[in-house]
UniProtKB/Swiss-Prot annotation:
<feature type="compositionally biased region" description="Low complexity">
    <location>
        <begin position="569"/>
        <end position="579"/>
    </location>
</feature>
<feature type="compositionally biased region" description="Gly residues">
    <location>
        <begin position="763"/>
        <end position="780"/>
    </location>
</feature>
<feature type="region of interest" description="Disordered">
    <location>
        <begin position="759"/>
        <end position="922"/>
    </location>
</feature>
<dbReference type="Pfam" id="PF10257">
    <property type="entry name" value="RAI16-like"/>
</dbReference>
<feature type="region of interest" description="Disordered">
    <location>
        <begin position="558"/>
        <end position="579"/>
    </location>
</feature>
<dbReference type="InterPro" id="IPR016024">
    <property type="entry name" value="ARM-type_fold"/>
</dbReference>
<dbReference type="InterPro" id="IPR019384">
    <property type="entry name" value="FHIP"/>
</dbReference>
<feature type="compositionally biased region" description="Gly residues">
    <location>
        <begin position="911"/>
        <end position="922"/>
    </location>
</feature>
<dbReference type="Pfam" id="PF19311">
    <property type="entry name" value="KELAA"/>
</dbReference>
<dbReference type="Pfam" id="PF19314">
    <property type="entry name" value="DUF5917"/>
</dbReference>
<dbReference type="InterPro" id="IPR045669">
    <property type="entry name" value="FHIP_C"/>
</dbReference>
<feature type="compositionally biased region" description="Low complexity">
    <location>
        <begin position="830"/>
        <end position="889"/>
    </location>
</feature>
<dbReference type="InterPro" id="IPR045668">
    <property type="entry name" value="FHIP_KELAA_motif"/>
</dbReference>
<comment type="similarity">
    <text>Belongs to the FHIP family.</text>
</comment>
<protein>
    <recommendedName>
        <fullName>FHIP family protein CPIJ015043</fullName>
    </recommendedName>
</protein>
<feature type="compositionally biased region" description="Low complexity">
    <location>
        <begin position="781"/>
        <end position="792"/>
    </location>
</feature>
Amino acid sequence: MAKFTLSSTGYCWLNNRGQSHDDVLGVVTHLDHMVTLLLVELHHCNKLSLPGAPAPPAPCLEHLLSENLLDKLYEWGVKTGRYGNAVRLEQLKLYEQLVSHSRHQLLVHEPFLRPLLKILDSSQNEIYPPDVEKRLVILLNQLCVALMQNVHLLDLFFFSNAQQNGNGGHTNFIIFSLLIPYVHREGSLGHQARDALLLCMALSQKNSNVGKYIATYSSICPVLVTGLGGLYSRLPNQIDIKSVDWYRITTDDVTEMPELTLFMNSLEFCNAVVQVAHTAIRQQLLDFLYQGFLVPVLGPAILQTNVESQVSAMAYLDLIVRSVSEPGLIQIIVRFLLDTDKFDGQRILDVLVERLNSNDSRLCMITLSLFDTLLALNCEDLMLELMLKYLLNCQHVPISHRYKVNRSDPYGSAVEYFLNVAPDIMKKVNNVLNTNNYNGNGSSAGNGGRQTISKTIGANWNHYGMNTGETLLASYQAYLLDARNRITQCKHACDQWNNIYRYQKLSKLVNSGVNGGGHSGEDVRTYKVQMIKNFLAEFTTTAPDSAVELLLDQQQQDHRSSQCQSPAQQHLHQQQQLQATTKQLDSLQSLGDSSGYESLNIMTICSGGGSAGGSEDGRRHESWKVSSVKEDTVVDLDLSEDLFAQGTVSLGPFLTAIWGKLQTFTSNCLYVNLHLTGLISHLAWFPLPLLHSILLRPDIPTTSDTPSFHQVLKILKQQIDAELPECEESLEIVDVARSFLVDREFRLINMRKNAIESNVVLGGSGPGGPRLSNGGGGTGSSITSSLSQTTPMQLTPSSSYDPFKRNDTKRKSITNSFSSIFRRPGSSGGSNSNNSTSGSLGGSSSVTPSLSASQHHLPPSGSGSSNSSPSTTTTTGSSGVSSLLMVGSSRRESREAETQFMDHPSLPVGIGSGTVGGGGAAGPASLTSMAQPGSGHSSLEYSLVNGVGSERQRDLAVCAVVLDEWLKELSAITQEQSLVMVAAATSEQQPNRSVVS
């Protein structure tokens, strides 16, 4: 029967006349029967058998190969005319099923391989219907899987034009060339094509012919880059999202935007190619990406002058940086930011720094978020260009205080400093909370005394199950744990850098030279003479060569006499010289201090004895994290020009912009302050004493041209203390502000669960999401994306919802279920306790869903932070959700998860584009403007309007709460950094790493 079926199939194409519809239909029917019989035989052949047992018979397969039926089928299909695509579709199905079930057994038989190569070769440069394209891509994918498992079969699919036409030509990898046109396709077709191409890229690592073909003759790299640029040009030029706290594109936003989905698919594919491809292919693709996408496409987009276009371009850049993971791609992005030749001498990084000073709150927020993303790369070159090159010579620190830079002892006083610089009203609040907690656990007499202290503080916390205590994180240990995790991760990344950035004192260099620890006696002698010569040159127009020569002669005589002494006498003489030199240097330093000089001119001599290649064997550097500065680079720090300078040292545009934004802390938008404090805390994580000298060391004064960080903190404290005095009214305002921020925290923590419940209750519909306008102004076509389908129900402190209550384990009543089904629309049923409010604060009961949720993706966090109390945060797997104020390390995860609670229509002018620092026509965003009656916000937000105090006082109260929690976080970071420095001092110094000082 099987042989009859195969024979009848062969009779159909013996007729050379034109094929009718019935003939084609008959062949297709017989092909189905033939494939079924062949699959049954292949199934029996693939079964495991005992050694030495005879192979099972396969008459159908033998007949198929012996009679060359597949070759005849191909020749017959060429003559089918208008039915050619239908016949080709059936042939592709046949090959697909046989290849997938036979593994590689049939590919080694010429009667099977020859017609397969013919049909593949004839498919080049052809346009097929979608169903034929789908089958072709599936077949190519199956072939790539088979070749990946059997690399020795690769040569079967390499053939040149000479083999067909006899006129020569380069070798062609037919499978790869057929897949290239489908690399940017949408849907499953493009996904399977990209998977197959990745398998081919992986094969290039195993077979040199594949790597040579792809790198030399294939057009995959230009196709990928041009396609990526084309997909970027299709992205909306303006992102119009009705939310004041929007700052980045999340993963959920990508899935809601088809254009962005295609772009990200292409970008992720490029990232995967760089990861698995041959070295030649990888380098070629990186060059094309830099020259064909970053410079001509992304660069001009970032340099646009329109604010809305700048916001969208920077949002796309932030998404790109967060999405790529391969070091090669990150390296060219860093190179793109630092390039000075491609954009008329203007660096992209400098442009981004300038936008930190923008008066547009949205542009400022997204710029702060972008720099937070860039800092998370832990890239040495970026840190060097942003800050370290301005701090390396330590000119910002007076001479008399430079010895403190590398010491860890004064860190203890810095911890107390940050706690003491908090606003007085917050100290009063913390005292009241501590007293209330103590009296609540004590006698009834203590409870009576609580009302005499404050009738408001702590009153709004009972529905959360407990008072939070000294911090909104419920425990200072939570800050310590989070700071420890972040500092450890950052230090581990910075250990791969080429250089250790710290200030090297003179005494250390002299001691190492005297003791033979890296400098010869002649080097130290020359060093001291040069130092004295430079110092004396500051006071005379002509260099006092005679004095220096006398000193030089004296040094030479001492050196000659020391050669005639015994080793013990030489050692004693060296110690005496060292003491004399130290006294001279102390006198010079005191002279500079008494004269008001800020620094002393020191020219460092870097050690040349370290081996540059020794550390390469012990660890693997990630090239993009490591600076392009070579390890054996000699850094010459000439400080002579700074000897008489006072207050003229610049910390660089980046730190200057951050300090300037911090000075307007009380006038900034709340969300700008959250991003700003988070960025500064991120800087404090780095294990860089030079950076600590301006952030975590209040005992070290600075001589910069702007107020120091600690001076700004004192100014903010004085400003808040002056406008928010310690009184009962201020305590009440602060209490409302704390409750507002706690309510915001629990909305973030329970966002995912509330989003699901919201979709169930609202039927998947919600308020309008962000609108993406393609083009400038209002002339472009608009693309509306319903990102608000995951909008969570807003929970207020006045509601009966208990965040610590477990899920209800009671069984649902069938009667109530049927009653709810058949209830009339106008009837009132049982209310859900989770959606009802008690009216204890707002005086009314309402259901208040949040207005937008375009950011609700929780990224994985490696911090491994845990909760020290139930009221801290919830942790699921490796995802972290921050504290309610999102201070420090946890702030980043919470901002990633943050939903948008405000809409522009319900806000006055200035919320979305408020000025920072008081300039401009539009005022800064205030909390009062965030809670307009009837806008659907929580009762707590409404109480901000109807509460006591002026609008300015309510805004200052929120600033005071944020500042207080941030200072506690900085205190915890300082404490943990001191422990890290102590541990590093006790461990052995790693060899072969140069010290940049």
